[in-house]
């Protein structure tokens, strides 16, 4: 059970970090 929770948390963090990096990249491109 603990492994599943850690896996879900890992996936959630990966999605959040990816979304933030993509969003920041788009803002940087638009700013130029």
From Swiss-Prot:
Membrane topology annotation: Single-pass membrane protein
Record keywords, A-Z: Chloroplast, Electron transport, Membrane, Photosynthesis, Plastid, Thylakoid, Transmembrane, Transmembrane helix, Transport
Location (main, coarse): plastid
Transport in keyword set: yes
Gene Ontology biological process terms in this record: photosynthesis
Cell compartment(s), UniProt: Plastid, Chloroplast thylakoid membrane
Keyword Repressor tagged: no
GO molecular function: electron transfer activity
Gene Ontology CC: chloroplast thylakoid membrane; cytochrome b6f complex
Transmembrane parts of this sequence: 5-25
Pfam families for the chain: PetM
Subunit structure comment from the entry: The 4 large subunits of the cytochrome b6-f complex are cytochrome b6, subunit IV (17 kDa polypeptide, PetD), cytochrome f and the Rieske protein, while the 4 small subunits are PetG, PetL, PetM and PetN. The complex functions as a dimer.
NCBIfam families in the record: PRK11876.1-2
Protein family: Belongs to the PetM family.
Its job: Component of the cytochrome b6-f complex, which mediates electron transfer between photosystem II (PSII) and photosystem I (PSI), cyclic electron flow around PSI, and state transitions.
Protein name: Cytochrome b6-f complex subunit 7
Source species of the chain: Emiliania huxleyi (Coccolithophore)
Taxonomy of the source species: Eukaryota, Haptista, Haptophyta, Prymnesiophyceae, Isochrysidales
Gene: petM
């Amino acid at each position: 059970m603990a492994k599943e929770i850690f896996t879900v948390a890992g996936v959630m963090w990966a999605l959040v970090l990816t979304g933030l990096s993509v969003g920041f990249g788009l803002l940087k491109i638009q700013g130029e």
